[in-house]
Amino acid sequence: MPNYKVINDITSVKQEPLNIRGATGVYTQWLVDKGDNPKYAVRRQVIKPGGKAPLHKHAYAETFIVLRGVGKMTVDKGVIEIKPGMCVFVSPNMPHSIVNIGSEDLEVITVISYEEDMSINVLE
């Protein structure tokens, strides 16, 4: 495991489509992964206009930091309109979803804890 890591341009990191049932227009870039740190990961996620990650839950905690664009998150049974500068923490096993409701890309940094069970349970 390296002592440090520098990414000069996070937009240049390989993008992977979010591969869960019902996800559309969501792309993930792993900035810090298990090879860098066994405790948590840092990801940049880009959600295209109209794109979404459906209602789902997982055993790991997740924090969303909104950098650009606007969206709507469902967390448990509440709905939050998100915009740049906001931070949303989602506890383990808390149902949540995110959708881009704007006309530009929704860009968020997500931090997730690594747990024994990293599976995602889609609820819709």
Residue ranges and their predicted role:
Residues M1-K39, N121-E124:
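A short, N-terminal "cap"/entry segment at the start of jelly-roll beta-barrel domains
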Residues T28, V42-H58:
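Conserved short histidine dyad/triad with adjacent acidic residue
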Residues D36, P92-M118:
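Ligand-binding loop in jelly-roll beta-barrel domains
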Residues Q45, F64, V88:
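Conserved GNAT-family N-acetyltransferase fold
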Residues Q45, V70, G78-I80:
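Well-ordered beta-strand scaffold positions
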Residues Y60-E62, V66-G71, D76:
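Glycine- and acidic-residue-biased ligand/ion/polar-headgroup-sensing regions
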Residues K77-P92:
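Short acidic-glycine-tyrosine-enriched beta hairpin
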